[in-house]
Amino acid sequence: MKIAVVALGKIGLPLAVQFAMKGHQVIGCDVNQNTVDLVNKGIEPFPGEDFLGEYLSNVVNAGHLVATTDTAAAVSESEAVVIVVPLFVDADGIPDFGWMDAATAKIAEGLKPGTLISYETTLPVGTTRNRFAPAIEKISGLKAGTDFHLIFSPERVLTGRVFADLRKYPKLVGGINEASTEAGIKFYEAVLDFDDRPDLTTKNGVWNLGTSEASEMAKLAETTYRDVNIALANQFAIFAEGANIDIAKVIAASNSQPYSHIHQPGIAVGGHCIPIYPRFYLWNDPVATVVRSAREANAAMPAHAVHLLEESVGDLTAKKVAVLGVSYRGGVKESAFSGVFGTVTSLLEHGAEVLVDDPMYTDEEITALGFTPYEAGSPVDAVILQADHKEYKSLTKGDFPGVKAIIDGRRILSPNNFEGVAFRCIGQGDLK
């Protein structure tokens, strides 16, 4: 089978490689010429994805994967098209379909009868049927569900472990009609493998969600649930700080009961998924007060971490504060919606001099993000740990001459390594 994958980003490229490893002929499409050139050389354009470098080199050398900037031409040669183009939201939470609409137009230009189109980008409910189907029909002159198949099948993977997650989680498929759904199921059964999951009541594999709307909502529901759960954990954590309770012990105790699944609190909820997809849901359901309140609560956590620091050292004016972590989580070079932005902004509003460190970023990259790099070993008044990189776990007060306070936003540091320093964690009282 010949397959076009549109957008070779941190999800799209591993998907293209996965399809190619199953023996299919894959054309990867991207608007970035540099990305296309690197892929055609078998070089991964971004670091941090397990096995991608090895697998990419293998499938390119075997002739199973090529890349191009000509999406319409690639689609015209393909039996199936998979779209993983990013969808953004503006400051008011309104989806910005610019990139998605442009990619959809290019796909429609090259579309031929009998092709399957699968959107994997997370979308508001109804988008596949009500926005993209008419757009494709208008440009191509073909009828959705009759001349071509159209489905929504959300990506459910985490960057850094895409190949493992593709095997681990059921692939959800829903089409605009039954024929499209069946075509989608047949396609994904041909391109994916699945781990045995005895914990599931339905066998792991490709799952029929019935409609594109159900499939769209399934992805929004699973990610919005996580955001709401984390917000609840964060509110528990803030209360625990004032009551001198260790919330980590409370959550562990609560979760020993099988119906309790409280997530872990922390300084921020970042990345391309959890901070964004609840806003898609709110676009569909603007009266969802629980979802809106949860999003606002999580967005306020970086400022809460700065409040803890202010409680520990007093006025932050002219204080040197090192923020550890540009990435939104440990082990991944990705700054999308990272807590570093809210943390730095809040510190600057309090008059602090802010320095930023991350072992995965060069000083030049940190500067390009608008931050001042921290020089390892230089004196600071305080430290806020924002990302749980493994490199940070063994840090001691000797690494930060003159440090008077530590705020551990991810609870990975050892208080014993900071004897004599005011040490605070999210969800725990003062550990002086």
Where are these regions (language model features)?
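Structural/interface elements that position substrates and couple domains in central-metabolism enzymes
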Residues: 1-432
